[in-house]
């Protein structure tokens, strides 16, 4: 029996049907991409708030911030614990730093959301008690904005998802149409918290479909072939097979930065996820060609994003 307040067990056992899935191709990417006005300024292209980093995991914040800036977003502010200030300032000079007021090592303080056009939370965040409280407070603030008709797109990844699994009732605070981006391990933790079957990949896909439809959330299940579950039964699937060049620590942080930056530019969360997946996979191919699959690291993916855009977008 699922946890109290969650859908009954017989509502999520169903046959996964991918025959009507949309395929994320180069053509799909080009069709979704919006031309950038030549007279635009940084305000035209959005402002991402990235909440990331913990003592010992500041590199995740660096990777996510660098990739977000490569996505085309006008401005990125990184909320970081004090221990990461100097690292971020040097590694990502283009980012604006918002240093946590209360903690040396983790996210613990409240954040003013004024001026941001999207929020991404999770890379290298840690799961401290102070961070769990800060996440709850943020979700409540975003849910209030949703109710008031001034929603902010939200992307939850990595330790933000692990915190949801630790306290499954936080799921009820996640605003509709937000995007969750679990890899298979994170998805299993969420499933176990909700008493959902999770042993096989098919179990995880069924659970993703159930969560997407019942909570009106977008859910990107990250595997060698990513599946994007969208409410009302929609499904997007990445074209082609896997690429082991992407199977490296930090790869998911790069994807989160890309998706967050795209959402901040005004793309719907599901559009940002599809575009981000396509860019990420293309960057993986480019990095593999440059470095080989074994030698590719997450920073190589960030460095390949510009070339990925050139491959994916038709010449002017």
Across the structure, where does each feature detected by a protein language model lie?
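Small-residue (G/A/S/T)-rich helix-start motifs and N-terminal tracts that mark the onset
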Residues: 3, 11-154, 162-179, 184-316
